[in-house]
Amino acid sequence: MIQEIMADLSGFLTYARSFRRTGSFVLDACLHCRRCDGCRIWEKTVKHWDVSAISVILTEAGGKLTDLNGVHYYTGLPELVASNGVLHSEILNLLKTVRSTVSRKLIEGKRLESFYFFSLRFAFAIHTRYKIQLHLNPSGDRSWNINSQKASICKGCPSSAHFTETLEFHYGKHHQTYVTKPQQPNQRD
């Protein structure tokens, strides 16, 4: 599972200006798909009660909600991609390309692993791969967060989200467990 998440995340980080995750599929779809020209959300193991309403809302707004093969949403799909429709096919192609390069193992049944242990493994994998400083607050056992400052100003864009490009990844109810990349000092000429 870690390899899949790392492959997906690496693929999006190659092409994305920013990456945000609130921990709620419905909230992400409503907020992020209205803001961007090519916004995308992909989610693993979504329950049908989390997706049913957003399927209607997104479709009525002109967006798309499909599985990783481009099949329109129906109850029981394990992985979903939501977008405002502009770059939906490109997102699907990116995910297919990234996932074809990763050897994926099929596991029968469900693997029991505490979410806290999974969060620690994921944070450590990010720390190791991207050389990002790791911070862990033990009071938050159901969350991880990656922040990384990227390039700055997007002229002519009314959205304040583009003025400081931030890469964020959040999961869970509590955002005390996090990984941050130290900011580079400003160099003067």
Swiss-Prot record:
Q: Which InterPro entries match?
A: Inositol_monophosphatase-like, Mn/Fe_SOD_N_sf
The processes (GO biological process) annotated in the record are: inositol metabolic process; signal transduction
One GO MF annotation is: inositol monophosphate 1-phosphatase activity
Q: Which domain of life is it from?
A: Bacteria
Mind telling me which Pfam families this protein's record contains? Inositol_P
The UniProt family comment states: Belongs to the inositol monophosphatase superfamily.
Name this polypeptide is given? Uncharacterized 22 kDa protein in trpE 5'region
Give the source species. Leptospira biflexa
Q: Which taxonomic lineage is given here?
A: Bacteria, Pseudomonadati, Spirochaetota, Spirochaetia, Leptospirales
